[in-house]
C-alpha cells in the first residue's frame, strides 16, 4: 500500500524537474556527436 501511495506522490514531488527529464533523452545523442567530433579531430591532427 505504501509503495502505491508513494508512487502517486512522485509526479507532484518531481514537477520542478520536468524540463530536466525532457532533456535527458538527448544526452546519448550528444555523446554520439561528441564521438564523431573527437574522431575527426584525431584523424586530421
UniProtKB/Swiss-Prot annotation:
The UniProt entry, under Pfam families, shows:
PsbK (PF02533)
Source organism per entry reads Euglena viridis (Cercaria viridis)
Q: What does this protein do?
A: One of the components of the core complex of photosystem II (PSII). PSII is a light-driven water:plastoquinone oxidoreductase that uses light energy to abstract electrons from H(2)O, generating O(2) and a proton gradient subsequently used for ATP formation. It consists of a core antenna complex that captures photons, and an electron transfer chain that converts photonic excitation into a charge separation.
GO BP term, example: photosynthesis
Name the family the entry cites.
Belongs to the PsbK family.
State which gene encodes it: psbK
Give compartment(s): Plastid, Chloroplast thylakoid membrane
Under the heading InterPro entries, the entry gives: PSII_PsbK, PSII_PsbK_sf
UniProt entry keywords in alphabetical sequence: Chloroplast, Membrane, Photosynthesis, Photosystem II, Plastid, Reaction center, Thylakoid, Transmembrane, Transmembrane helix
List where the protein spans the membrane: 17-37
Q: Identify the taxonomic lineage of the organism of origin.
A: Eukaryota, Discoba, Euglenozoa, Euglenida, Spirocuta
| Annotated PANTHER family | PHOTOSYSTEM II REACTION CENTER PROTEIN K (PTHR35325:SF1), PTHR35325
Subunit details for this protein?
Answer: PSII is composed of 1 copy each of membrane proteins PsbA, PsbB, PsbC, PsbD, PsbE, PsbF, PsbH, PsbI, PsbJ, PsbK, PsbL, PsbM, PsbT, PsbY, PsbZ, Psb30/Ycf12, at least 3 peripheral proteins of the oxygen-evolving complex and a large number of cofactors. It forms dimeric complexes.
Topology versus the membrane: Single-pass membrane protein
Q: Name one GO cellular component term.
A: chloroplast thylakoid membrane
Q: Which residues of the precursor form the propeptide?
A: 1-8
Report the protein name in the record. Answer: Photosystem II reaction center protein K
Q: Which cysteines are joined by disulfide bonds?
A: none
Amino acid at each position: 500500500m505504501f509503495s502505491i501511495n508513494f508512487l502517486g506522490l512522485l509526479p507532484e514531488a518531481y514537477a520542478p524537474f520536468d524540463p530536466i527529464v525532457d532533456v535527458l533523452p538527448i544526452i546519448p545523442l550528444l555523446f554520439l556527436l561528441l564521438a564523431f567530433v573527437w574522431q575527426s579531430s584525431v584523424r586530421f591532427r
